Amino acid sequence: MSTDRTQHEFRRRQIESGEARCAIFRRTYDAPMEDVWDACTNPVRLSRWYAPVAGDLREGGTITQGDFGSGTIRRCAAPHLLTVALGGDPALDEIELRLQPGPDGTTVLEFEHATTLDSHEIGGQIFDAVYCMGGGYGPRLVTLGLHLRGELPADLDPTTLHLLPEFAPAITASMRALDELVQTDKAGAAPCA
């Protein structure tokens, strides 16, 4: 688990509530696209590697993501695209899952989180909102791979990944990559992954 094969990208784009800063996580899985789609949209499977998810998992439906808030499914085009608006009306954040076939039966997953928020408070400290995404999504993309390979421990609670030492390398790598991209953006240079 110490090797992080996740690629990171940063960009800006418009969402419902204004200009958003976007963190993009790209990873290739050795699994068919339909299996990756099911793992990312089936509430039973999501609860194993991501978080408990409940609600109406159709376009226009409302979902809850455990302690991660609730949202509305804006677009759903199985097995390629899922867009969820989060944080009110208009949405302050948007997450988008994009899948495409990769070489030799693999699947390329792109997970994008767009936010109009500048910061998040964690443990009484203020952090850049994009920087914080690395700590959450980095280890979850690792656990998705373990889940797809049938190697995820049965007693793993995905809501506590940040507390488990075996996921520290994925958290650190993701947060470091996103911090570099955010700093590049603040300096006015064109960011690259």
Please report, for each region that a protein language model flagged, where it lies by residue.
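Short beta-edge strand/loop motif at the mouth of beta-sheet-based domains
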Residues: 17-18, 24-25, 31, 35, ...
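Hydrophobic-ligand binding "helix-grip"
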Residues: 54-55, 62-126
